[in-house]
């Protein structure tokens, strides 16, 4: 058409030049530019290019087209059309006007680069340049184009027009472009896309099937292949990856067409080439690259169900890549790693996990030859992929606390891979791996499993000093913020790694000790653990082989551990002469190191002398401690001992006492700790006298000395604790210093009150004295034996009580400028100078210590605190006798004290508030508010939050406060309820908050319950909602939170084999411990006690209301949702409470219980309801009439829940046990069962048959003669159930329901225990593993004592040994992949109509065919299977399409979809005229096999490597069309059942159609071929 128009214009014009001039005139527009292009192109085709026309073309180019290109730069909607037309017209002008115009325009454009018009000009004229004459210009053009493309910010026209034009240019331009590309240097990560853009544009010239010089053959260039690999594996955008695949595919195609051997030079002489071709192995090579490209294309789909079936092809690639003859690589392994890189980079984390697992499993099948590229891949991209925590989640079906499948595979892979590495490369590989762990911040879970994998590597000499340093870096850099238990376990594994992999000949004992110091002793390296013993044994075996230590002597013993430790202690204790005397304390790290090595050396010696004399161990310990004991013994007499030395000695003493006690569960002092404690006690008198002198003789005069004060008080506390442990006797060395210390401190404080202008030294002494008194008060509180009997105690108490509260220490002015301190590494509390902040810490310490003393006094003399002002006694203890002022002072001090100093204030308030609750309610409420505000602000501060929260709970929820508040029912009562709700709300975000609250309240109520007073427990009823919330507490955690909990449970299950379990105390902050605490508390209450009974009944009513409100809630209710879990916990608790219910109480709640049976519940809840009804009817048969009445409601109302009551009826033998006259009950049971055996609902009939069989068996057992007339009917019904249900799955279902645990094994009385309620029944009924509470969890929770009756805990039947059955587990049972060996049954608890479980029966088909014949419809033999489709809109549309085109049957996953409004809206009643059959997804395998046996061809609508084109496919008459799921398509196991896959030809970019549209296209094509007779033979 365009040619005709151009010819018409040229015919009408006499001169072409005039026509061109006319077209160039007027307003520039896209239409005018396109018309000009048409005319010029037609003139060029005619070959007219001389004379006037050439001149006219030159003028058009110069005067019109070039300005037009520049003018269109401004934009506008028509700009692209103008650019395209003008560029094409300009190219024609250049050809018409001659080569001079092209050269001139090209030179001008090169000067104007990188503007868009210049790019358009070059794209237009580049193909017009001549090779020999314009070679320099062509080379300039080639280089400029490539540089512009690689710059990254080039105009879009570079890739769209300039580079394709360059490909059409002469060879000099191509060669210059290739040289520019090759000399660009190593490509950065962001340069891969631009490079591939250039290569794709030049591919026809660089990868051509014509003979070309080798330097222009991209296949021979290593840089080309590395760029392609980067695009395949690392490119983020799909277009770049597509270009890389295109280049690879073209290179392979060109190699096959040329049929010439070639090879890209290898990167090294040992490995294979990046690319090579051999004509002899053409078929093998083509197959390899076809599979490779196919895999890379499949990975673009990003869908696991599409990709997983292709992974076996990846295995085949590895098999082809390794020579079977010599075991070396044929193909460069970097090609295989590109596939894994692509999988690791996928947005689909499931796909990334599959990629990681596939790589880790490689060495299970075949041992691959060593390759540096593979090692780099493991330490690079694989390590990056392994850093994702979500990869380590447990598989579906694995119990809680199971090992991570990926963690196990990683462990096995690392063991296998390192065992195959050459010895000379193993060290380098492991070092890089560990350094990679230290180079980045890892989450806790990956570090744990990587550390375990490293610890599993067999022992070898792989790591030297650098490796040990890398392990230290992992400990110190990557694990600071990890969860404590996970961090402790990882440290254990890293220590085992060091012991297995370190070459002891390359490291010294100093290196080892420095590494051990980086382990946290309070988390991993505790004495007495299995790990400690393993470390000692390793040191024993290797101590003679360590490299010489810098501390060693020259006598040949430098490598001995004993010699090293002896020198270490000597060097530590003595004060170095070169070290200046400083006012600051030394760092604690050296003391930690020395104490650790002393204890290790002693235990190593113990292993050596295990079967010899034990005295040697004590002698070795004495040798180590001699320098220390000698120095300690001189402390009390040598006044000139350097301060630094005394500090070090006392630090070492503290660390030794802290570390020497074994950390085994229930461990007591062993001979080492006993000997060590005895040795230290021998110097106790000297040490205690030294401490007394330093604390009382004004020797501590500087702010920095306050750190020393803390050290001295810690030493004194340790000595007191040790003396009490050994036996506190009058006149012992410790007791002799306590009274002088107390008196001196009081004297100093009294003197300080009288001074007008205090100096720094006096103020420091004042702080020291108060700190000493606080330490003594805490010691007496902890060890009552220290309480002095002397009359001197009362004056001290009176003095402390008379001190002004919250007195702020005056900042000393005279010395403040001259005092300053420098920061210490150990983060001392007093390390700042006397700035406001620095002195503020001193004041805070003083106030804290004062409130410690006051807290001690108030608890000691709590009986003296008056409740009202009229009760005040004569002033003995002023503070105790003025509680209002004391409480107000407490509120004041809370506003100034830091979070770490408020504990004693809370303890004081705990004593004061109960006394003032009646008279000063407003002040008490204010104290609650202030305290809660502080606690809520600390929720992100781990170190201070938990101790403060515990003190807060003890204060606000004190039993006396709760009792008084409940009695008054005033504002305090409602404030407590408000705080209670806020704490429960906080606990949903921060696990463990509710645990502390419920534990404290239950413990205090149990103490009250065991008291003599009858009313002491009565107030608990007023707070029963707290127990209610505890019984149903527990949130649904995010996936990452569940992963952390799973891994923590896994570590706990390791037991004492993991040292972290022994050392780290389990805080029991998990949510299920809240429920355990509440349940154990309820189990301990006595139903015969009136107050207990009232409490339990009130709780039961609240539980039933909770269940009812949950049922009415509009929250989405599905299996294991929060609503399901709450209802589940409600009925579990009601079962626990049942023994306390009497008949009168049950009269009030029985209707609610029966009503709950009519509610649509999950299976687990129905079991609990049924169980409770059985127990009620068993204990109180008087409620049987109400039970029979439940069967009398209209069928429409109860058809979905009548199965609940039929299940109860099936346990008739339990119900009638306490009924003397059983005949009427049995008769009624048979009547009801027979009635419901006639129900139209298949599920109801099955339940009724079970109940009938059980009742009839009971009648025969009891020889109930009055039912003899029913024998024939009942026996016939039961016989039919056994034998006549042979068609379809009915017989299987009848057998399954009889074998179901609730009807076969479960015994309502013998199984009535905590184990069944909280573990066995949830497990058997499909509740998530997070809800299973094993019996050992109850036993481990010792804060609440267990019930004396052990039978209440353990089940008496074999119920716990069963596995979940199909009847209740249809939605979680066997997967599609297992359907051929285990079919599934519908969950009758979910209101599913199960008649469609059986295959399509012939009578049903005939019925629909007969109806269709009467209506004149044409019936095909096409079956459409839509069981995998989820959305009702798609199902409704398919139903309508199938009915319109006369399909035989539409198979759906559940006939419930028919009642969905969305389905009905799209089906427009088509379901009434089309046979619908229910086949659940788990039954599809059997259904497809059955239909294949009947002669059907199973056709899948799926894109696969061997799919048939729909346009070419001929449908058989008996066709079964299987449609895939909306998201996942057809599962891989079902694809194997397909006879053929048909795909719809597509022209667009989007890779898939809506499933309804796809199905409709195939249904129409079948109808067109089979029924309309329009089929054409395939071409």
UniProtKB/Swiss-Prot annotation:
It is an enzyme of class 2 (transferase). It holds the Pfam family TARBP1. Gene3D superfamilies: 3.40.1280.10. The keyword S-adenosyl-L-methionine applies. Keywords: Acetylation, Methyltransferase, RNA-binding, S-adenosyl-L-methionine, Transferase. One of its GO terms (molecular function) is tRNA (guanine(18)-2'-O)-methyltransferase activity. Transmembrane segments: none annotated. S-adenosyl-L-methionine-dependent 2'-O-ribose methyltransferase that catalyzes the formation of 2'-O-methylguanosine at position 18 (Gm18) in a subset of tRNA. Selectively mediates Gm18 methylation of tRNAGln-TTG/CTG and tRNASer-TGA/GCT. Gm18 modification can enhance the stability of modified tRNAs. Monomer and homodimer. Belongs to the class IV-like SAM-binding methyltransferase superfamily. RNA methyltransferase TrmH family. This is tRNA (guanosine(18)-2'-O)-methyltransferase TARBP1. It comes from Mus musculus (Mouse).
């Amino acid at each position: 058409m365009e040619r005709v128009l151009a010819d018409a214009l040229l015919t009408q014009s006499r001169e072409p030049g005039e026509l061109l001039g006319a077209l160039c005139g007027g307003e520039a527009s896209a239409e005018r530019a396109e018309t000009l292009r048409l005319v010029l192109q037609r003139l060029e085709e005619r070959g007219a290019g001389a004379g006037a026309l050439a001149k006219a073309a030159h003028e058009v180019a110069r005067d019109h087209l070039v300005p037009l290109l520049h003018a269109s730069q401004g934009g506008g909607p028509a700009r692209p059309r103008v650019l395209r037309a003008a560029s094409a017209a300009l190219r024609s002008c250049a050809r018409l006007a001659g080569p001079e115009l092209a050269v001139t325009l090209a030179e001008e454009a090169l000067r104007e680069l990188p503007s868009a018009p210049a790019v358009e000009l070059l794209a237009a004229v580049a193909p017009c340049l001549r090779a020999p004459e314009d070679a320099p210009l062509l080379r300039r053009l080639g280089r400029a184009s490539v540089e512009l493309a690689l710059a990254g910010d080039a105009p879009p026209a570079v890739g769209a027009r300039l580079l394709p034009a360059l490909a059409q240019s002469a060879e000099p331009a191509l060669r210059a472009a290739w040289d520019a590309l090759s000399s660009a240097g190593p490509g950065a990560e962001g340069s891969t896309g631009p490079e591939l853009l250039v290569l794709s544009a030049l591919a026809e010239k660089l990868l051509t099937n014509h003979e070309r010089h080798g330097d222009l053959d991209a296949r021979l260039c290593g840089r080309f292949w590395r760029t392609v690999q980067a695009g395949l594996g690392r490119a983020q955008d799909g277009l770049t990856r597509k270009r890389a695949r295109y280049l690879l595919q073209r290179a392979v195609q060109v190699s096959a067409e040329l049929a010439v051997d070639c090879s890209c030079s290898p990167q090294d002489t040992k490995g294979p080439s990046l690319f090579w071709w051999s004509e002899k192995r053409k078929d093998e090579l083509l197959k390899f690259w076809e599979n490779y490209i196919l895999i890379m294309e499949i990975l673009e789909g990003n869908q696991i169900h599409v990709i997983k079936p292709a992974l076996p092809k990846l295995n085949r690639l590895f098999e082809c890549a390794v020579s079977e003859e010599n075991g070396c690589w044929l193909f460069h392994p970097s090609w295989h790693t590109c596939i894994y890189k692509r999988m690791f980079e996928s947005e689909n984390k499931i796909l990334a996990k599959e990629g990681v697992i596939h790589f880790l499993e490689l060495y299970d099948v075949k041992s691959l030859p060593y390759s540096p590229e593979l090692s780099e891949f493991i330490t690079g991209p694989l390590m990056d992929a392994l850093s994702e925590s979500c990869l380590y989640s447990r598989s579906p079906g694995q119990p809680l606390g199971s090992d991570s499948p990926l963690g196990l595979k990683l462990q096995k892979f690392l063991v296998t891979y390192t065992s195959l590495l050459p010895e000379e490369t193993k060290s380098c590989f492991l070092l890089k791996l560990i350094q990679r762990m230290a180079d980045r911040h890892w989450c806790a879970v990956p570090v744990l499993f990587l550390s375990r994998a490293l610890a599993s590597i067999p022992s070898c000499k792989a790591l030297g000093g650098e490796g040990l340093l890398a392990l230290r870096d992992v400990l110190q850099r990557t694990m600071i913020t990890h969860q404590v238990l996970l961090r402790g376990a990882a440290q254990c594994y890293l220590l085992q790694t060091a012991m297995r992999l370190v070459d002891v000949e390359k490291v010294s004992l100093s290196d080892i000790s420095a590494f051990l110091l980086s382990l946290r002793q309070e988390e991993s390296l505790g004495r007495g653990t299995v790990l400690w013993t393993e470390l000692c044994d390793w040191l024993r075996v290797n101590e003679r082989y360590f490299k010489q230590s810098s501390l060693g002597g020259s006598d040949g013993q430098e490598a001995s551990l004993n010699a090293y430790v002896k020198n270490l202690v000597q060097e530590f204790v003595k004060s170095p002469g070169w070290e200046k005397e400083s006012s600051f304390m030394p760092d604690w790290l050296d003391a930690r190191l020395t104490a650790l090595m002393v204890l290790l050396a002693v235990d190593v010696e113990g292993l050596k002398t295990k079967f010899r004399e034990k005295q040697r161990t004590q002698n070795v310990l004495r040798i180590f401690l001699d320098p220390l004991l000698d120095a300690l013994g001189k402390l009390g007499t040598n006044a000139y001992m350097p301060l630094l030395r005394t500090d070090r000695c006392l630090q070492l003493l503290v660390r030794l006492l802290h570390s020497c006690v074994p950390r085994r569960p229930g461990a007591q002092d062993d001979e080492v700790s006993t000997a060590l404690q005895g040795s230290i006690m021998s110097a106790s008198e000297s040490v205690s006298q030294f401490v007394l002198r330093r604390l009382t003789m004004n020797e501590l005069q500087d702010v920095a000395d306050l750190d020393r004060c803390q050290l001295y008080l810690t030493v004194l506390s340790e000595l007191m604790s040790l003396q009490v442990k050994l036996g506190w006797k009058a006149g012992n060395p410790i007791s002799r210093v306590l009274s002088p210390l107390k008196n001196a401190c009081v004297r100093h404080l009294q003197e300080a009150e009288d001074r007008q202008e205090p100096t720094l030294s006096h103020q420091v002494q004042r702080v020291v004295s108060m700190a000493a008194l606080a330490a003594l008060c805490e010691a007496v509180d902890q060890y009552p034996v220290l309480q002095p009997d002397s009359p001197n105690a009362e004056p001290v108490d009176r003095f402390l009580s008379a001190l002004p509260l919250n007195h702020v220490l005056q900042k000393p002015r005279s010395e403040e400028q001259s005092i300053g301190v420098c920061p210490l590494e150990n983060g001392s509390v007093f390390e700042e100078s006397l700035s406001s902040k620095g002195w503020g810490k001193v004041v805070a310490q003083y106030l804290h210590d004062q409130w410690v003393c006051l807290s001690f006094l108030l608890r000691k003399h709590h009986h003296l605190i008056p409740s009202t002002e009229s009760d005040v006694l004569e002033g003995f203890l002023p503070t105790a006798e003025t509680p209002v002022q004391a409480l107000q002072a407490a509120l004041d001090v809370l506003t100034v004290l830091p979070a770490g100093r408020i504990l004693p204030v809370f303890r004081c308030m705990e004593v004061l508030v109960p006394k003032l609750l009646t008279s000063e309610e407003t002040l008490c409420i204010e104290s609650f508010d202030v305290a809660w505000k502080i606690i809520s602000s600390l929720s992100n501060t781990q170190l201070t939050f938990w101790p403060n929260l515990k003190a807060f709970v003890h204060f606000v929820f004190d039993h006396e406060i709760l009792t008084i508040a409940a009695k008054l029912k005033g504002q305090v009562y409602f404030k407590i309820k408000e705080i209670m709700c806020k704490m429960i709300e906080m606990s949903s975000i921060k696990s463990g908050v509710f645990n502390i609250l419920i534990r404290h309240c239950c413990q205090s109520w149990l103490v009250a319950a065991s008291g003599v007073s009858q009313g002491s427990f009565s107030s608990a009823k007023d707070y029963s909602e707290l127990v209610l919330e505890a019984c149903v507490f527990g949130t649904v955690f995010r996936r990452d939170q569940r992963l952390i909990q799973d891994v923590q449970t896994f570590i706990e299950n390791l037991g004492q084999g993991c040292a972290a379990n022994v050392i780290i105390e389990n805080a029991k902050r998990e949510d299920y411990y809240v429920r355990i605490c509440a349940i154990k508390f309820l189990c301990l209450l006595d139903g015969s006690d009136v107050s207990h009974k009232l409490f339990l009944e009130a709780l039961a009513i609240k539980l039933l209301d909770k269940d009812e409100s949950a049922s009415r809630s509009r929250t989405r209710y599905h299996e294991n949702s929060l609503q399901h879990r709450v209802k589940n916990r409600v009925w579990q608790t009601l079962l626990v409470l049942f023994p306390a219910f009497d008949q009168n109480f049950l009269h009030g709640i029985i209707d609610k219980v029966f009503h709950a049976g009519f509610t649509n519940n999950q299976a687990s809840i129905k079991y609990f309801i049924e169980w409770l009804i059985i127990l009620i009817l068993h204990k109180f048969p008087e409620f049987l009439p109400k039970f029979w009445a439940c069967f009398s409601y209209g069928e429409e109302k109860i058809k979905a829940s009548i199965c609940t009551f039929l299940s109860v009826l099936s346990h008739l033998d339990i119900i009638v046990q306490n009924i003397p006259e059983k005949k009427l009950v049995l008769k009624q049971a048979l009547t009801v069962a027979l009635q419901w055996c006639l129900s139209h609902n298949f599920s109801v009939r099955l339940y009724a048959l079970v109940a009938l069989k059980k009742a009839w068996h009971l009648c025969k057992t009891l020889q109930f003669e009055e039912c003899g007339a029913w024998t024939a009917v009942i026996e016939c019904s039961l016989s039919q159930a056994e034998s006549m249900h042979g068609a379809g799955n009915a017989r299987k279902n009848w057998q399954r329901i009889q074998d179901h645990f609730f009807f076969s094994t479960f015994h309502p009385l013998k199984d009535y225990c905590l184990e069944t309620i909280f573990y066995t029944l949830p497990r058997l009924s499909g509740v998530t593993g997070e809800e299973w509470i094993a019996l050992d969890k109850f036993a481990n929770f010792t804060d609440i004592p267990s019930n004396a009756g052990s039978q209440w805990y353990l089940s008496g039947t074999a119920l716990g040994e069963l596995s979940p059955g199909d009847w209740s587990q249809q939605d979680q049972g066997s997967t599609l992949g297992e359907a051929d060996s285990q079919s599934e049954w519908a969950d009758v608890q979910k209101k599913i109509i199960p008649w469609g479980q059986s295959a399509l029966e012939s009578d049903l088909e005939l019925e629909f065919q007969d109806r269709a014949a009467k209506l004149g419809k044409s019936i095909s033999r096409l079956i459409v299977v839509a069981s995998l489709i989820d959305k009702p809109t798609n199902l409704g549309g398919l139903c309508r399409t199938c009915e319109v085109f006369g399909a035989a049957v539409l198979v759906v996953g559940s006939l419930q979809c028919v009642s969905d409004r969305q389905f009905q809206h799209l089906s427009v009643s088509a379901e009434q005229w089309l046979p619908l059959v229910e086949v659940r997804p788990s039954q599809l395998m059997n259904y497809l096999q059955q239909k294949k046996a009947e002669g059907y061809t199973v056709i899948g609508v799926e894109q696969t490597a061997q799919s048939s084109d729909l346009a070419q496919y001929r449908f058989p008459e008996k066709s079964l069309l299987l449609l895939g799921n909306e998201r996942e398509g057809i599962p891989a196991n079902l694809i194997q059942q397909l006879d053929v896959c048909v795909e719809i030809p597509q022209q667009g970019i989007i890779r898939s159609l809506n499933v309804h549209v796809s199905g409709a296209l195939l249904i129409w094509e079948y109808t067109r071929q089979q029924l309309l007779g329009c089929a054409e033979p395939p071409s």
